[in-house]
């Protein structure tokens, strides 16, 4: 997306998340003139977008020539001259197929951005821990576990794993509703 890598030709885009990032990437690549093949291990492309958004996005991508293949996982990527040889494995049957493309792009989510949480953890009065039983019971899950520390700390959203904004807000609501 930064424009530092100039992709052209045939691009195999593997989407492990089924959300916006891979589809935006497919759009950018198609607009650059690439032939894009979107691959998903899931039963449906863009399964996390919901029916309203996915219908519009998939229509727009299809009109740009993007093709979609489901139930496929990447088994191997090997260099073949200046191209890539990609072995796909069908997730239900185990059958493999080999494809040669110019580029492979893999969307597998983000690495948690949890450095601030870990920096603050020892200074919090709950050591960054939440009471899972209390949270399940709909009670305040933030409980001090030591006298030291002047604040309660919880980790949520992208500090845990790649999440969409709705999941992060739901985390925050469940954890903070009783504060």
Which residues does each predicted region cover?
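A Rossmann-like FAD-binding core segment of flavoenzymes
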Residues: 7-8, 31-135
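Internal hydrophobic alpha-helix adjacent to the cofactor/substrate pocket in enzyme cavities
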Residues: 25-39, 166-179
């Amino acid at each position: 997306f930064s424009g530092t890598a100039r992709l052209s030709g045939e691009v195999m885009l593997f989407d492990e998340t089924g959300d916006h990032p891979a589809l935006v990437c497919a759009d950018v690549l198609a607009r650059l003139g690439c032939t894009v093949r979107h691959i998903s291990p899931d039963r449906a492309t863009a399964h996390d977008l919901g029916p309203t958004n996915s219908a519009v996005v998939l229509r727009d991508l299809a009109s740009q020539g993007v093709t979609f293949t489901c139930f496929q996982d990447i088994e191997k990527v090997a260099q073949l001259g200046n191209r890539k040889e990609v072995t796909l494995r069908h997730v239900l049957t185990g059958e493999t197929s080999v494809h040669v493309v110019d580029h492979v792009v893999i969307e597998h989510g983000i690495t948690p951005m949890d450095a601030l949480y870990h920096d603050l953890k020892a200074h919090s009065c709950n050591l960054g821990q939440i009471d899972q039983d209390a949270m399940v019971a709909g009670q305040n899950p933030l409980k001090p576990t030591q006298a030291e520390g002047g604040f309660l700390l919880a980790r949520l959203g992208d500090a845990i794993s790649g999440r969409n904004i709705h999941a992060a807000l739901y985390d925050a609501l469940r954890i903070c509703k009783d504060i």
